[in-house]
Curated annotation (Swiss-Prot):
One of its GO terms (biological process) is bacterial-type flagellum assembly. NCBIfam families: flgK_ends. It comes from Bacillus subtilis (strain 168). GO terms for cellular component: bacterial-type flagellum hook; extracellular region. Keywords: Bacterial flagellum, Secreted. The gene is flgK. It comes from the Bacteria. PROSITE patterns: FLAGELLA_BB_ROD. One of its GO terms (molecular function) is structural molecule activity. This is Flagellar hook-associated protein 1.
Amino acid sequence: MTSTFMGLETARRALSAQQAALSTTANNVANANTDGYTRQRVSLEATDYFPAVSKNAEKTAGQMGTGVQGKSVERIRDIFLDYQYRLQNNSAGYYDTKAKALSQMEGVLNETDDSGLNSVLNSFWNSLQELSNNTNEESARSVVARKGQAVAETFNYISESLTNVQSNLKAELNTTVLDVNSLLSQLNSLNKQIAQVEPVGLLPNGLYDQRDLLIDKLSSMVDIKVSYNKSGGNALASAEGTVSIEILDKNKQSLGTVLDGKNYEVSELAANYDNETGLVSSISIGDTAVQAESFSSKGSLLGFIESYGYITADGQEKGVYPEMLSDLDNMALEFAKAFNEVHRNGVTKSGEQGGDFFDFTGGETEPAKGAAGKIKVADSIIDSKGANIAFSLTGAANDNANATKLANVLTGKITINGKETSVLDYYAGLIGELGIEAQEANRLASNTETQLNDADINRQQMSAVSLDEEMTNMIQFQHAYNAAARMVTLQDELLDKVINGMGVGGR
């Protein structure tokens, strides 16, 4: 038969189990607004039945339950939902970075008002047209000089501003690399702590939450693959183990392991820059250098690399800002060369041969390099307030032929970057391509943000604390606790009857 005190022990176990459930519920409520917290529950299981199976087991009507015990405190989390969230978070990090970089470029070019380069070029063209109609007007020549100076200064401003934004992108790129390394270091520390807790049969849920939050942040910067390494000892089956993390390329192939969860090692990232151009040449993962053009791991880091600029294995400069700066440099160079050639063939009002209207200094091997930032109107034109403008071909007072040719430089065909086009059309093409690219980046950023929010909602429905649900659970566990307490009282009354109310005859 069962022990006299078996019912008391069964009730005690019930009290202990329901108390653990209530404590877990209280912890859920307390952390309802804690970032990264995953709701928890006590996994309850029935204790062994009595009597145990054996040849000498006591003959009873059947095995009797002996109560309940808390097996573990587990998180309510779905690894597939984590994967979906991090996948969208990765895309969002990449497209958001590209969209912001393109938006900053649009802000610099400023083609929505009258201060943009297109408007300034048109004003310059109009001043040349006015000069061709009024060759004897000193004011017309002075206006051409000022408008030409405005063109040069606008080129200078755009080049300088784009270079400044590019420098800011480099700083953000370096900060992102530091952030990645910091997250990896923190994850490695958590791995070590988890490896100490799990083998003794406990689940470090708080450490799991911290780790998942850090992995979420890391996923926005680089594309990662997370794998789990089971702990030894007496680890529970539900123990997650330590994590190892690999960086993936666009084809989901590994570029290298950055966190080794078995050996607790971190391979830090480093951005390497080309000495000549200053652009990204490679990304180091530990001791392995990956060429910048081959580093295709999506995320904000790649967004910064593609925006700031990188150099290919054959020396080509690629990226949003280097390519725009190169296009503007080539445009400024070819425009100035064509304009100067026409101006040199003309004659000033005083009958002197025209010289260069624009001055610029380029490199010997790459004359276009930095041309947009260096172009200026020749000092002779500025100092004479336009008197030295060669508007004529013959020197005759009413000869406006060269002024007309100068105006045609802006609208006529010249070769820029191997294309037969006009200066105005070439720049309009640059702005059009930028607008399309920025619009597409904004669209993708918006779409991925929506998908990220949907993935987050799905995950929150599974893992977030619902106060309504916790209140319901609290009432359920409270009633169970009260019933167990009542069972203790009942057992006490039964024992009192046995001890104090039986066998009193003959006293």
